[in-house]
């Protein structure tokens, strides 16, 4: 064994991400090493060029969050809040003023609600103090990530998490305009809010939540009502109305954008394709909520989808066409393990075809899967694969069994399906499935 071989073996045994070499023979066999060990054999220049994505990435690798137990928790006592983690000393905030704010909010539970994101040890990761400011308005009085997470990758994903789910994942909040009223919001959180559906107008940030299924006329009436009641600025209301018109005219990109902005709402108009995509139970556990590894699959009291964005790899056959679609996740397998039913819905934002190794290199930071998962499924690095980028995953409170699903499809004029691969369904079938799955158990 040469010195290079020895170092390569050590790198593989220690689960290194990459091995740098000028050895042409090793470089020629790089795909084989990747397939066998998950170790990327590359020239030093290639590693340096990818250093930003491999080492200095600001995007948290979701698979690192497995079993972290991160959860959203309603605060009931001021003792539960680590005030020092959220005080903005730069703007001369004082512990006394924060204590007064928290104490006052707790004394008015019908008007205020305080939620924290915490880890398994009870450490505060983020805080959301919200105020019911009217029939359709919720103000985010304080909306902050803990100072201990500043500059960390975990801090960045928690930032994306609360920006995407300011009021949690509940589908029962009703029509709401969420207004960011924190006097000193962090700039990175503001940017995340803009990525996650907030709209900026006159130095203020607004998010429109329209849960449920909406017809075009019904949505337009609801938006006009929000404007007339001064819940939403006229200019933003007009922009939403125009977007809904564009969607109703058949523009798929506008429909996708509209549903991203009103999440978790869905629309009956537009031409957004819908697919039922099968997924194995263990992969569903990886993608939807890391806390379920030690619990029954997708417990319906789960209120937190930790990864706002993710990627799922499948074989190219019968894959969704185009970049925009709705995905209904059919968890396959044994009913005893939580399979054999529809459990969640997501918004497809991009579909890419390529080899397993190329797609893994592109999406490893976004996905939760390790290389060995892909090798178990696809067999070899050069196998063709299809990567589905998706976001806005919604866990249903009620599952739809295979028999119930097929009854809906047969009623819609389709044949019964076993869902061994992705199946496109109609808007009418989707509405029935979605409305039934959205009902409380």
Report the location of each language-model feature:
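Short coil-to-beta transition motif at edge beta-strands of beta-rich domains
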Residues: 316-333
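Conserved acetyl-CoA-binding loop-helix of GNAT-fold acetyltransferases
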Residues: 150-167, 191
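Acidic, PIN/NYN-like endoribonuclease modules and their adjacent C-terminal/linker elements
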Residues: 17-18, 24-110, 127-129
């Amino acid at each position: 064994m040469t010195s290079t071989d020895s170092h390569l073996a050590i790198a593989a045994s220690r689960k290194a991400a990459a091995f740098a070499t000028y050895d042409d023979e090793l470089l020629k066999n790089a795909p084989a090493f990747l397939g066998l060990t998950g170790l990327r054999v590359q020239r030093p220049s290639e590693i340096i060029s990818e250093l930003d994505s491999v080492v200095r990435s600001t995007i948290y690798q979701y698979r690192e969050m497995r079993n972290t137990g991160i959860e959203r928790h309603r605060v009931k006592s001021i003792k539960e809040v680590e005030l020092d983690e959220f005080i903005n000393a730069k703007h001369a905030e004082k512990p006394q003023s924060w204590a007064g704010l928290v104490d006052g909010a707790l004394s008015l539970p019908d008007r205020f609600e305080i939620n924290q994101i915490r880890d398994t040890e009870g450490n505060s990761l983020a805080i959301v103090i919200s105020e019911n400011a009217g029939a359709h308005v919720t103000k985010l009085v304080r909306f902050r990530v803990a100072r201990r997470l500043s500059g960390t990758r975990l801090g960045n994903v928690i930032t994306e998490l609360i920006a995407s789910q300011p009021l949690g994942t509940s589908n029962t909040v009703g029509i709401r305009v969420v207004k960011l009223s924190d006097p000193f919001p962090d700039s990175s959180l503001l940017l995340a809010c803009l990525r996650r559906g907030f709209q900026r107008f006159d130095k203020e940030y607004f998010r429109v939540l329209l849960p449920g299924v909406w017809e075009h006329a019904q949505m337009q009436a609801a938006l006009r009502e929000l404007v007339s009641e001064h819940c939403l600025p006229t200019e933003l209301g007009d922009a939403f109305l125009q977007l809904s018109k564009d969607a109703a005219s058949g523009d798929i990109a506008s429909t996708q954008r509209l549903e991203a902005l009103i999440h978790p709402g869905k629309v009956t108009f537009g031409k957004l394709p819908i697919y039922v995509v099968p997924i194995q139970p263990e992969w569903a556990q990886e993608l939807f909520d890391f806390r379920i590894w030690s619990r029954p699959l997708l417990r319906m009291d789960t209120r937190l989808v930790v990864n706002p964005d993710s990627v799922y790899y499948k074989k190219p056959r019968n894959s969704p066409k185009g970049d925009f679609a709705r995905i209904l996740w059919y968890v396959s397998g044994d009913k005893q393990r939580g399979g054999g039913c529809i459990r969640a819905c997501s918004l497809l934002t991009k579909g890419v075809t390529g080899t397993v190794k190329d797609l893994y290199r592109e999406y490893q930071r976004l996905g939760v899967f390790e290389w060995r998962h892909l090798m178990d499924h696809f067999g070899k690095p050069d196998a063709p694969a299809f990567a589905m980028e998706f976001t806005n995953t919604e866990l249903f409170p009620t599952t739809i069994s295979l028999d119930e699903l097929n009854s809906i499809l047969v009623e819609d004029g389709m044949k019964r399906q076993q869902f061994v691969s992705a199946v496109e369904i109609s808007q009418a079938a989707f509405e029935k499935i979605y409305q039934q799955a959205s009902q409380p158990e």
